[in-house]
Curated annotation (Swiss-Prot):
Keywords: Hydrolase, NAD. The active site is at 86. InterPro entries: PP2-like, TIR_dom, Toll_tir_struct_dom_sf. The TIR domain mediates NAD(+) hydrolase (NADase) activity. Self-association of TIR domains is required for NADase activity. This is Protein PHLOEM PROTEIN 2-LIKE A8. It catalyses: NAD(+) + H2O = ADP-D-ribose + nicotinamide + H(+). GO terms for molecular function: carbohydrate binding; NAD+ nucleosidase activity, cyclic ADP-ribose generating. The keyword Magnesium does not apply.
Length: 354
């Protein structure tokens, strides 16, 4: 089978931290899981990504930066104090409400972890004895081992009808579900910020073909201006028409104040096919159906390589208090059939004009 010519952007969005133990696991199962997660547009962190020579504090920071931790319990897990320190930090972050965890029982019975049975428990007790002069540390290990395995997780038995590839796909679906739930909790229909602006996020827009995973993928990021997790849409590969549109009711705006609409996007260095113009439109429809339409054309290739950019669509004056209006905005390219990729859509923002 020929390799796909599409280039996937580097995954962005909430970080997923992998907590595990063992070279065999790293060189085997994880060596396939990691690229599969990146292919699924999951922003995964494994400690090999850390600079060699850094200490445990750096990994604690990585855990604190993450929104999901995948804890892979295996036979050798309790032989590592480093791994247990990470687990204790994961528990602390869960308690603080900033992290979700998914326990994975890799060729290990959940009861072996929960009850510290067999070799898993014996190894833990040996390690606990080794650090008997640091009871606070070992107590944190024990508490983490008692709580995290009780969370909803997945198990691959020693002898299973499923192969590792099938189990890996199940893991990825569970992680994507967790990320989606995080995004939905913070994904506002229309969210305001401290500057009086509003964001209509990508998931609330109509994006042609965004339900086709071969053309678009969805992931979640933390949006600092709006202090919320929101979903973003990333174009993978399409020859089809592009149309992204949305609407907003003006009742939330200050009457008589001038506002601007901006399209918030990013195009990384791998983006292709943006030399031809796209059209941006803004339509203001009053309650009496009187309408004012503005349109402009521009090339998006000038924005390639930048971080998030605000592309002006147009401005308008919010109607007076007793009047009513709705605005409609869009970005489209209907005729060009050149292959395109790399566009990341955060949403449209409505904010006071400068």
């Amino acid at each position: 089978m020929a390799a796909s010519s599409s280039v996937r952007p580097t995954p962005t969005g909430p970080q997923v931290f992998i907590n595990f133990r063992g070279k065999d696991l790293r060189n085997g199962f994880l060596s396939f899981l990691e690229p599969a997660m990146r292919e699924a547009n999951i922003n995964v962190f494994i400690d090999k990504d850390e600079v060699v020579g850094t200490d445990l504090v750096n990994l604690f920071v990585r855990i604190q930066e993450s929104r999901v931790a995948v804890v892979i319990f295996s036979k050798d897990y309790t032989s590592s104090e480093w791994c247990l320190d990470e687990l204790a930090e994961i528990k602390d972050c869960i308690n603080q409400g900033g992290l979700n965890a998914i326990p994975i029982f890799y060729k290990l019975a959940p009861s072996s972890v929960l009850e510290l049975k067999g070799g898993f428990g014996d190894t833990f007790r040996v390690l606990k004895e080794k650090y008997k002069n640091d009871p606070e540390r070992t107590q944190k290990w024990q508490e983490a081992l008692e709580s995290i395995p009780k969370l909803k997780g997945l198990r691959l038995a020693e002898k299973s009808d499923r192969n590792e590839r099938e189990f890996m796909n199940e893991m990825i679906l569970e992680i994507q579900k967790a990320l989606w739930q995080i995004a939905m909790k913070g994904n506002p229909k229309v969210e305001s910020n401290s500057k009086g602006g509003f964001l209509v996020p990508a998931r609330r827009l109509t994006i042609a073909h965004s339900d086709n995973p071969e053309k678009w993928t969805w992931s979640a990021i933390y949006d600092r201006p709006h202090k919320a997790d929101i979903e973003i849409a990333t174009m993978i590969n399409t020859h089809a028409l592009i149309k992204i549109s949305g609407d907003f009711h003006t009742r939330k705006l200050i009457p008589g104040k001038k506002y601007e609409v901006v399209f918030i996007v990013s195009l990384d260095d791998t983006s292709l096919g943006w030399k031809n113009e796209v059209t941006l439109t803004l339509k203001v429809v009053m309650s009496d159906e009187a309408a004012n339409v503005k349109a402009k054309k521009l090339c998006l290739d000038e924005y390639i390589g930048e971080n998030w950019v605000d592309i002006p669509v147009g401005d308008f004056e919010a109607p007076q208090e007793k009047e009513d209006a709705k605005i409609f905005f869009s970005m489209y390219q209907l005729l060009n059939t050149e292959r395109k990729s790399g566009l990341v859509v955060k949403g449209f923002a409505i904010r006071p004009a400068q």
